[in-house]
Amino acid sequence: MKSILIIGMGEFGKHLANRLVELKAEVCVVDKNKDIIKVLAEQFENAYVADCTQDIALRDFGIHNFDACVVAVGKDFQTSLVITSKLKEQKAKYIIAKASDDLQSKFLIMAGANETVYPEKDVATKIAQKCIANNLLDMFAISDDYSVFEFNVLDEWVDKALKNTNIRAKYKLNVVAVRDGDDIIAPEADYIFKATDTVFAFGKTSTIKRIIK
């Protein structure tokens, strides 16, 4: 079981913590606001009040024991920088820090973050893609260039076997799963697409242009 420390329990931190729990991770949540933690303590077994800009607070958590530490502090960028730097000093295995733009990301990487995320930018990108692509239901960025797409099965695939759709050659996509009603399956080559199916496929993010309807 992966163990994750999340520092900063704003909306992003809360959603992340909930999703990690759903994925069976061991989650420790921290915020300096005692009122926030009082509420979260009813939901999370490990919920603590602490000012993580202070060395002694971080030492108490045994930072090196976590598989990843997420700095999800809201609008106070200086605090994010300080916490990221101190996590690095205390030998955090992997640090993910929230950024608002490329400049913040650059400084967070310099301070010790292994990776930065842009929640607002990612959500805006996803909504924009969905607005222009009626078929697109969701997308999950894997890297700057590649994503997993969830979209309604294309009309031309209905009643065809996966192996006969020419998906890889025509659309540059690899189908990884199909949602059939309430079930998500890994389709075999002879799987026959239904009109009600939704498809999960992996490919270059630019491939979205190929499935826009």
Language-model region placement:
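Cytosolic regulatory regions of ion transport systems
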Residues: 1-213
